[in-house]
Regions:
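Non-catalytic pre-domain segments flanking phosphatase-related domains
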Residues: 1-37, 69, 196, 200, ...
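Active-site neighborhood of HAD-like aspartate-dependent phosphohydrolases
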Residues: 16-75
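Alpha-helix N-cap and loop-to-helix initiation/capping positions
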Residues: 51-55, 88-95, 129-130
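Substrate-recognition element of Asp-dependent hydrolases with the DxDx(T/V) motif
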Residues: 60, 64-97, 110-123, 162
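Short secondary-structure boundary segments
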Residues: 79-80, 173-176, 199
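Structural recognition of alpha->loop->beta junctions
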Residues: 96-116, 182-208
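Conserved Lys-Pro-Asp/Glu-containing loop-to-beta segment of HAD-superfamily phosphomonoesterases
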Residues: 126-159
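Acidic, Mg2+-coordinating phosphoryl-transfer loop and its flanking beta/alpha structural elements
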Residues: 150-194
């Protein structure tokens, strides 16, 4: 079964193995915030087939920085089926993610990891959202607790992951979100936990929930 790809630095697996071997106590798993990429952090461009087409929303870095300051891991999980469809090479996905990390770092923000699925639906992989493969891989590699974590996206289909791992969901009205909410919400079998204007508003909800 095909597995998700990652664009973040390799996890410190050896150090973790040494701690386990030494019998050292393991840190309690933390909850995290999982963000979609296109339409949530950056502008929705359809199939993003060139580096110059990537544009970070002006509020995104500050929103992520606020989560960083509270010690909340922030992880991107994104479907990039354009790779499987032959619209662009997988190397471009990694270049976009390096640029994303660079721009966030310049604004004092950081991501704990970026995971992407390069497959299309017909590949029957384990990682394409709304399947939970990317979430579960991130949880293993970063010692996270999915139950109680947050999933934020402009696509309702992504938020279908949330009940499968007992996470909470926020639909943002950037990207496809506004139209998805206006025209399709009555057909949704389960409503998102919250619906807000953008990522900045989503972070307000998340931080208030932790008081």
């Amino acid at each position: 079964m095909k597995q998700p790809s990652r664009s973040s630095p390799p996890p410190r697996i050896r150090a973790k193995q040494r701690r386990r071997a030494a019998g050292a106590p393991q840190p309690a798993p933390r909850t995290a915030v999982f963000l979609d990429r296109d339409g949530t952090i950056g502008e929705e461009m359809g199939y993003l087939n060139h580096l110059r087409r990537f544009h970070l929303y002006p509020f995104a870095a500050r929103a992520i920085r606020r989560l960083n300051r509270r010690g909340i891991p922030v992880i991107v999980v994104t479907n990039q089926s354009g790779v499987a469809r032959g619209f662009f090479p997988e190397a471009l996905v990694r270049r976009v993610h390096r640029l994303l990390q660079k721009r966030l770092r310049a604004a004092g923000a950081r991501l704990a990891g970026i995971y992407y699925c390069p497959h299309q639906k017909s590949d029957h992989c384990a990682c394409r959202k709304p399947k939970t493969g990317m979430l579960r891989q991130a949880a293993r590699e970063h010692a996270l607790r999915l139950a109680g974590s947050w999933i934020v996206s402009d696509r309702y289909s992504d938020l279908r992951m949330a009940p499968r791992v007992r996470a909470r969901s926020i639909l943002v009205k950037t990207g496809y979100g506004r139209g998805d909410y206006q025209w399709h919400r009555k057909t949704w079998p389960r409503q998102p936990d919250r619906v807000v204007e953008d990522l900045a508003a989503a972070v307000n909800v998340i931080l208030r929930s932790r008081r």
